[in-house]
Amino acid sequence: DALVFYRLGDFYEMFFEDAKIASCELDLVLTGRNAGVKDRVPMCGVPFHALTGYIQRLVQKGYKVAIVEQMEDPALAKGLVKRDVIKVVTPGTVIDELFDERSSIYLAAVVDYQYGFALSICEMSTGETTVTHIPRNILHLQQTLLKNNIREIVVKEGFDEKFIRAVRDLSAVAISYCAEDQIGEEYLPLCEEVSDGAQREAYGLMLNYLIETQMRMMH
């Protein structure tokens, strides 16, 4: 569900539907290329040195961006150049050069359980994380997200649709999905003080989402 930016020489290129969206949102010229199919493939691009500004604009509009880099020198590659996703930038995980130090970026994982919602909330610039419970109520959920300046929430597939719609009504909050909420053994020391089962599940959901979107760039 992310717009994919492919590094091709001195440019990052987008194709197909991603190109149509990016050209509209970023005021880029939409072109096309022959790719062995009946119709020309829609495409657009941005210079590599201007990438940060374009990603920032997309993230501010609620989009997620996957950055695909060349993993080998094209001059030395045998056949197709090896490429891989090195990072996924989302509204709730935007850090480093894209981060505005004057404002805090908060990501929340929300787990629905019998008596309410369990939340794990992370401030991305410091990594400070809190866990809490709130009543299973649409208005209370909306107020909690707004009060804590949440930019993005992470939920599991199958999360109650009426609450998803309520979050979508808050245009400043993006919604993402993550399937895994189990905490790997190497990360268990991070949540030693979280004993509540639902809160621990929310913490695990958030942690796995961060690993999924951010850890590639650390390898």
Residue positions per predicted region:
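Basic, polar low-complexity surface loops/patches
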Residues: D1-H219
